[in-house]
A protein has these predicted regions:
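N-terminal, positively charged nucleic-acid-binding surface of large information/translation enzymes
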Residues: 3-238
Length: 239
């Protein structure tokens, strides 16, 4: 390397700004559903990256200024559906809360074995975290309602006439209507390969409860008016 090249490299290195770090930081890792044990994909695909970042920031800005949190997601149709199937087969006895508590404990044990440095691994539907989630969710919805950011919409939803119950996304199984899709399972509005569609387009739908074709009924729910925030979100992304 010539003297000119060395001098140019030195000059370039002087112009590189040091990274700026926040005074405090909250690091989060995706919350696994409370119906399964953690596997290598969870650890390597979610927690290791967040753990490395949390450890790095603790070294830079001090451990007291970094909080690394995650937890068990206690809500969702996969949990309720798996719980129902196990109870019907006689493979689990207890409440759905006890079912989730069982897997929450197993998940925490696995994370401890891998030495993932979480400050808190909670559970959205258990203990004090359950109370906090309820309070925060209520406050969030009431604030949106007060500022007219919610609207009522009527949509079609699957209904099992034999069990007299509305079916959630995982309680309906059929074939994906997207052309060329090779998925072996299509659920209410999304197949196992991630294609999304309207529930009415699902081919040959069957209720996992009765095994029969469910009816379609109109259901009215509150929806967040995301369109109102299009410009604001665009500005935020540009920043």
């Amino acid at each position: 390397m010539s003297n000119n090249e060395i001098n140019n490299n030195i000059s370039m290195s002087k112009n590189i700004e040091r990274p700026k770090f926040p005074k405090r930081a909250v690091i989060t890792a995706g919350m696994p559903y409370g119906n399964k044990e953690l596997h290598l994909g969870h650890i390597g695909g979610v927690f290791v990256h967040a753990d490395a970042f949390a450890r790095f920031l603790r070294d830079r800005i001090g451990k007291d200024n970094v909080i690394f949190v995650s937890g068990t997601d206690c809500y969702g149709s996969p949990i309720s559906e798996n719980y129902r199937q196990l109870v019907e087969k006689g493979e689990f006895k207890g409440t759905i809360e006890e079912y989730v508590q069982h897997y929450h404990k197993l998940q925490k044990e696995v994370l401890d074995k891998y030495n993932i440095s979480l400050n808190l691994f909670g559970a959205s539907g258990l203990g004090r975290a359950k109370e906090i989630h309820r309070e925060m969710s209520l406050d969030f919805i009431e604030t949106l309602y007060k500022h007219n950011h919610l609207k009522k919409l009527t949509t079609s939803q699957f209904y099992d006439t034999e069990y007299d119950v509305l079916l959630n996304g995982r309680q309906v199984v059929g074939r994906c209507p997207i052309a060329g899709c090779s998925s072996d399972k299509g659920y209410a509005d999304e197949c196992s390969l991630g294609h999304q569609y309207m529930p009415s387009d699902l081919i040959d739908p069957k209720s996992t409860l009765s095994g029969k074709k469910p009816a379609m009924v109109d259901v009215t729910n509150w929806y967040f008016n995301l369109d109102e925030f299009h410009d604001l979100l665009g500005q935020w992304v540009e920043q």
